[in-house]
């Protein structure tokens, strides 16, 4: 079978058979792919660590006959979430699931790959709040899907919003002024701080967002 090299991060894994694992891997060059890692659940397997959730590795893969390529070699690059920290593990898991659900298979998108890797890295960084990483990734993914919410003008009447709290509604697609919020039963109040976080995330400046 022909082989190829790629860098990937594990989004999902499922035990298969007596000793194998089926992996969902997000790669920079090939997008989201399915991989089978044979024998990795056996004691002493060289590749076991490379099949951990959120692990990032340089992989050598053999083209499979079906939908799954075969993991043959791997070299760890980084990103293994500290699962002992429940909050960090939970945020990393949601980031991985978001990427898995949103991204189509075999559609390379290096920018989205970097977004996911950065979010997972922040989830493992003791100096970062993992919830902020999750909000950042969610906001950026929404933008890339074309569903960016209106954050500066009222999504209903288009009136510029003052620097005060406002009301968010998914139905209208953004923030509402006080006058329009009364007519929407599904609104959620957002504080000034939350609105600022959303606006910084929308600007796409990761360095500013992490401050």
Give residue spans per PLM region.
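Non-catalytic alpha-helical scaffolds and adjoining flexible linkers that form interface surfaces
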Residues: 1-211
């Amino acid at each position: 079978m022909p082989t190829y090299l790629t860098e990937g991060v594990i989004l999902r894994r499922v035990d298969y058979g007596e000793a194998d694992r089926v992996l969902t891997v997000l790669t920079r060059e090939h997008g989201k792919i399915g991989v089978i890692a044979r024998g990795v659940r056996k004691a002493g397997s060289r590749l076991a660590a490379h099949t951990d959730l959120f692990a990032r590795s340089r992989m050598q893969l053999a083209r499979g006959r079906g939908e799954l390529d075969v993991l043959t070699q791997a070299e760890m690059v980084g990103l293994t979430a500290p699962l002992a920290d429940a909050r960090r593990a939970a945020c990393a898991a949601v980031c991985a699931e978001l990427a898995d659900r949103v991204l189509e298979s075999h559609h390379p998108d290096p920018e989205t790959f970097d977004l996911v890797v950065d979010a997972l890295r922040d989830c493992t960084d003791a100096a970062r709040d993992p919830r902020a990483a999750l909000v950042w990734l969610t906001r950026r993914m929404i933008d890339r899907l074309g569903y960016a919410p209106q954050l500066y003008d009222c999504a209903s009447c288009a009136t510029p919003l003052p620097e005060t709290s406002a009301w968010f509604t998914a139905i209208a697609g953004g923030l509402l002024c006080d006058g329009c919020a009364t007519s929407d039963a599904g609104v959620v109040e957002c504080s000034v701080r939350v609105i600022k976080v959303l606006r910084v995330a929308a600007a796409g400046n990761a360095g500013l967002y992490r401050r």
